[in-house]
Amino acid sequence: MIPNITQLKTAALVMLFAGQALSGPVESRQASESIDAKFKAHGKKYLGNIADQGTLNGNPKTPAIIKANFGQLSPENSMKWDATEPSQGQFSFAGSDYFVEFAETNGKLIRGHTLVWHSQLPSWVSSITDKTTLTDVMKNHITTVMKQYKGKLYAWDVVNEIFEEDGTLRDSVFSRVLGEDFVRIAFETAREADPEAKLYINDYNLDSATSAKLQGMVSHVKKWIAAGVPIDGIGSQTHLGAGAGAAASGALNALASAGTEEVAVTELDIAGATSTDYVDVVNACLDQPKCVGITVWGVADPDSWRADESPLLFDASYNPKEAYNVSQLLSRQHAFDLYLKLGNLLLSRLHSD
């Protein structure tokens, strides 16, 4: 009897997952077998994660997993304003230097995060009311932090979370004092500080192509680019609820229409971490030519800011979830091609008997 297509697909999946089971512990896996290497094999720049001194010096499995599985790192907190310039003109780079040294030592691409953000902002900044003062403070902060790592970082999130849910600019000290011109000031200063770094605007809830927030992002970025503001990329944080991965493709495609060189998924975590949701997001990036990579926002669930939702690729025991192994397949098309190859092979043998 000739097996039907469902039986063939099931056989293919068994073979695929058997291969994953034999691949060895993820903390000791060779880089050539990593999820990052497989992502790069599909033409992308990286599949990364986050780190900081605290997490790197916590559970020893965290740095081991990062070294073996991810090709890019973003700092979770060490490059934010309250960490780098807690008092005016007094810069502290202890945490960020530790992070950068770890990333460089282990050959990881680095994304800087973040220069201008309304949150984790020292009160001495948020209390400024004078345009000239705030402009000078912004320029000095951006220039000093970026020059500390000039030539070492692939990209920077220059401005972060500047939109409300209706697509208008968020109320912050920057927008209140400078209006939307703070965006131009930030990006022009960043370009001068490190001309080689890719400069991003980054935000959350950009997960539906039809949402007012996403549409507001696209329209503003188009306008700013037309005015000469040097925005190279849009970062979609992609903090998702369960079942929301299916909309990722449409959302990334919509963001890509804004006219930037790049888009990226910058802070991925998904409630429940189902393989379906993670594969949907991976495929969304693979299918969008401007999407350069994905950064997962944490290694294992205990370290996540959403720990109670189990949103990451590694569980509380630092073991890989099904979503990690399935994501290694990288795309439905890749898996479907394997189904077809296996099916054709079996059918040809059956017909030749």
Swiss-Prot record:
It comes from the Eukaryota. PROSITE patterns: GH10_1, GH10_2. Keywords: Carbohydrate metabolism, Glycosidase, Hydrolase, Polysaccharide degradation, Secreted, Signal, Xylan degradation. Its EC number is 3.2.1.8. Residues 50-330 form the GH10 domain. It is found in: Secreted. One of its GO terms (biological process) is xylan catabolic process. The keyword Ligase does not apply. Pathway: Glycan degradation; xylan degradation. It catalyses: Endohydrolysis of (1->4)-beta-D-xylosidic linkages in xylans. The N-terminus is blocked. Residues 1-23 form the signal peptide. It holds the Pfam family Glyco_hydro_10. One of its GO terms (molecular function) is endo-1,4-beta-xylanase activity. Disulfide bonds: none annotated. InterPro entries: GH10, GH10_AS, GH10_dom, Glycoside_hydrolase_SF. Belongs to the glycosyl hydrolase 10 (cellulase F) family. Hydrolyzes oat spelt and birchwood xylan randomly, yielding xylose and xylobiose as major end products. Monomer. This is Endo-1,4-beta-xylanase. The lineage of its organism: Eukaryota, Fungi, Dikarya, Ascomycota, Pezizomycotina. The gene is XYLP.
